[in-house]
Swiss-Prot record:
Entry superkingdom: Bacteria
Protein's recorded name: Small ribosomal subunit protein uS7
CDD domains linked to this entry: uS7_Bacteria
KW Zinc (keyword) present: no
Gene3D superfamilies hit by this protein: Ribosomal protein S7 domain
Any GO BP: translation
Alphabetized HAMAP family for the sequence: Ribosomal_uS7_B
Summary of the function given for this chain in its UniProt record: One of the primary rRNA binding proteins, it binds directly to 16S rRNA where it nucleates assembly of the head domain of the 30S subunit. Is located at the subunit interface close to the decoding center, probably blocks exit of the E-site tRNA.
Family: Belongs to the universal ribosomal protein uS7 family.
Classification of source organism: Bacteria, Pseudomonadati, Elusimicrobiota, Endomicrobiia, Endomicrobiales
Length: 159
């Protein structure tokens, strides 16, 4: 149990908008990208990938980033539910904040798993692919939706 009182729910979770673009989504992405407390490196990776996105697509990188997140965000996911000794994978709708967090985690995880290029290039390529509804992150979303569809029979166990 915390010794200090927790902040109200409205004030928890969402960071201040980032300094360059004024976007809360980008600030959340930078916070997730943060590695070993080195936020300045995470910011340089993010802004560097935005420069690459602008160079390759000729579009506003923030709109490409937001479109990529929209294309990756899952609408359904399966959650384990134990009923009478058996565990069922129950499909459930995903709240907006969780779906955005999942999308951010998937983008970063996939970019980190690739090898051979600097992180800003891998991240930029993954964001561009996701904005075109291509790439591994979109495939991950489709797999999540397929899993929910396959377990639709257990939807009545929803709580």
């Amino acid at each position: 149990m915390p010794r200090k009182a927790l902040k109200p729910k409205e004030k928890r979770g969402l960071p201040e908008p980032d300094s360059k673009f004024g976007s809360v989504q980008i600030a959340r992405f930078i916070s997730k990208l943060n590695f070993e407390g080195k936020k300045s490196i995470a910011e340089s990776i993010m802004y560097g990938s935005f420069d690459i996105i602008k160079e390759r697509t000729g579009e506003d990188p923030v709109s490409v980033f937001n479109r990529a997140l929209e294309n990756i965000r899952p609408l359904l996911e399966v959650r384990p539910r134990r009923v009478g000794g058996a565990t069922y994978q129950v499909p459930m709708e995903v709240p907006v904040i969780r779906s955005t967090t999942l999308a951010i985690n998937w983008l970063i995880g996939i970019a980190r798993s690739k090898t051979g290029k600097p992180m800003r290039e891998k991240l930029a390529q993954e964001i561009i692919d996701a904005s075109k509804k291509e790439g591994a992150a979109v495939k991950k979303r489709e797999d999540t939706h397929k899993m929910a569809e396959a377990n639709k029979a257990f939807a009545h166990y929803r709580w």
